[in-house]
Amino acid sequence: KVVIVTPAGREKYLSIFKKFIYRKIKEGLIDEWQLWLNTINENDISYLKSMEKENKKVKIYTIDEEIVPTWESYNALQTHKFFKYAQEDDTIYIRFDDDIIWVEEGALEKILQARIDCPNASFIYPNIINSTICTSWHQEIGALSEEFGSVNKEKIGDLDYAYLDAFNYTDSKLIDHIHKTFIKRFKEGSLSAYYLPNKSFKDYKHFSICSLCWWGKDKIQPTAFEEPQLGWEIAEKMKRPVFFVGNALMVHYAYHTQREYLTEKGDIYLDFYNATSV
């Protein structure tokens, strides 16, 4: 089985992303989409319920405690409590955070194929535009120019060289540049410029966790500090490599430190992603 899990959720993003997931459900690739209800926003909760009604393979999952927001109306420190629903032995789980707003055709299939071909890998990670480590790599290969500033380059032994680079996830000019560059490349048909080699890593990297894939049989169970744990610590503890699928491309809209700026601009980029999501 293939199950998608999404800590959920914000209507303005899910209304775009669901079109991709629904299409893959219709194609028979996805068996279930778990919406992990992690918000107190009543409008968003109503939207999640409408999604559950409109597609029989969408199901809302809850936890037996109150959601206490840390940012906006959701609590990232409670997300780990939903992992108990993602531990069936015969299932491949793929996490997409609710602000993954574009996935290249074929990327999901590439992730699943990598999961099957690399059974010993602890996690499979895709190539995510606007994720800290990938932004650094995209600048290194020239897919994203440095005209608005450079993010930190890799430092051997420093797992957080990109993750803790505040410029990487807070600068307003950089996030504009990231989205504008993607839109330009999309229109000119040069998205392959972002591609990186598929690679197994035994020297762990701090990957973004807004999308990753694991086996249910591994009984993955992070704690409240899931970011470093899912990014590299669990893999290191398991003593198993991770696998990066460099040609499985997707777009992460915003870190919470970028969101206020984009919202104040009117979320102008969402119109593009909505128009290109089918």
Task: List PLM regions with ranges.
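C-terminal catalytic/acceptor-binding lobe
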Residues: 1, 16-17, 168-278
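Conserved catalytic core of nucleotide-sugar-dependent glycosyltransferases
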Residues: 107-220
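Short, well-formed alpha-helical segments that are part of the catalytic scaffolds
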Residues: 10-29, 43-47
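Active-site-proximal specificity loops/subdomain of glycosyltransferases
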Residues: 35-95, 101-108
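Short aromatic-enriched loop/helix-cap "lid" or pocket-rim segments at secondary-structure transitions
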Residues: 47-48, 107, 135-140, 255-258, ...
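Short catalytic/ligand-binding loop motif for oxyanion handling, primarily in non-cytosolic enzymes
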Residues: 13, 42-45, 102-104, 131-136, ...
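A structural signal for short, well-ordered beta-strand segments and their strand-loop junctions
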Residues: 95, 103-104, 122-127, 243-245
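A conserved hydrophobic helix/loop-capping motif in glycosyltransferases and polysaccharide synthases
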Residues: 3-11
